[in-house]
């Protein structure tokens, strides 16, 4: 499949402790590269603080990266005038991302008014068609967001993102706050939309079980750096990077000794690790040696599988 969305060497830092005499910056993303193919669901995994949401904001142009380039269909984002129409985002909390003062019809009509020149009749037709696609009742368009369940609000958020027929939807922890049964419904909806209309998804999550269900490929992010990427089958059945192995051990029922809580404790000082030389994971890696402390491992790619680790021999 052709590459649709590509990020090359994206880096992002933020100013902290600013004051009268200046401040210091903390690197949150460091040379992150990824490719999203047409009609694909690519998952980005990593625990809190790994840079997942920051990466999402760069990919939808909510923020500008410090360096690197993002392209859509081979064209730089900067040269695409309607980029916000072609790449849309779904946020984690629909209650916060949906204006509580607006009815469903207004929420769905707003992007059509702002980003298209469609007349009112065509906007209405598209709104009702999109409601049908996400499984919402047309008779509910006059309701406000607070009148819906969490799963229904997330369907509204999905409808709002897809109503412009974007090429890519970036989903940032969009199902993490939902209970298991509602989560399954939303995941099924995402897969159906991909299969029926060929929409590409970049699915950001910390939940490995979700990735197993929904994704074609997975990219593992740690301390703002890519540790490993490849097909879900390859990466999860034969993890090459020690951090990926640790993540998989944390999944309940995996047989690993770690707990899900332990994974959240892997990065006690992410900011400091990002600023130091060498492998970002070396402080927690049982295989780390002096080479890992002095040099950052390059990303090695073979047949669509990539890993950044000096200790990995064959994958």
Residue ranges of each PLM-predicted region?
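ABC transporter nucleotide-binding domains
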Residues: 1-237, 307, 313-315
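Charged, flexible cofactor/metal-binding loops and thiol motifs
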Residues: 17, 231-315
């Amino acid at each position: 499949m052709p590459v649709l969305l590509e990020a090359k060497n994206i880096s992002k830092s933020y100013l902290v402790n600013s004051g009268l005499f200046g401040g210091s910056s903390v690197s949150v993303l460091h040379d992150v590269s990824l490719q999203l193919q047409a009609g694909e669901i690519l998952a980005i995994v990593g625990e809190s603080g790994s840079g997942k949401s920051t990466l999402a904001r760069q990919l939808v142009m909510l923020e500008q990266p410090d360096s690197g380039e993002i392209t859509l269909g081979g064209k730089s984002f900067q040269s695409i005038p309607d980029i916000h129409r072609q790449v849309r985002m779904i946020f984690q909390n629909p209650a916060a991302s949906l204006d509580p003062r607006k009815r469903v019809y207004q929420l769905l009509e707003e992007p059509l008014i702002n980003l298209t020149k469609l007349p009112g009749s065509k906007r209405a037709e598209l709104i009702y068609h999109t409601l049908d696609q996400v499984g919402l009742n047309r008779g509910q368009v006059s309701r406000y967001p607070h009148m819906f369940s969490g799963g229904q609000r997330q369907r509204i958020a999905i409808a709002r993102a897809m109503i412009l027929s974007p090429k890519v939807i970036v989903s940032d922890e969009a199902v993490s706050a939902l209970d298991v049964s509602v989560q399954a419904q939303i995941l099924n909806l995402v897969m159906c939309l991909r299969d029926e209309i060929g929409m590409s998804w970049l699915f950001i999550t910390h939940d490995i079980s979700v990735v197993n269900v929904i994704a074609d490929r997975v990219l593992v992010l740690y301390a703002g750096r890519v540790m490993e990427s490849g097909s879900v089958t390859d990466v999860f059945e034969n993890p090459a990077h020690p951090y990926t192995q640790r993540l998989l051990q944390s999944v309940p029922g995996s047989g690993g000794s770690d707990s899900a809580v332990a994974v959240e404790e892997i990065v006690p000082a992410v900011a400091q690790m990002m600023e130091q030389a060498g492998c970002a994971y070396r402080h927690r890696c049982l295989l780390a040696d002096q080479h890992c402390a002095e040099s950052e491992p390059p990303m090695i790619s073979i047949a669509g599988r990539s890993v950044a680790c000096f200790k990995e021999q064959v994958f």
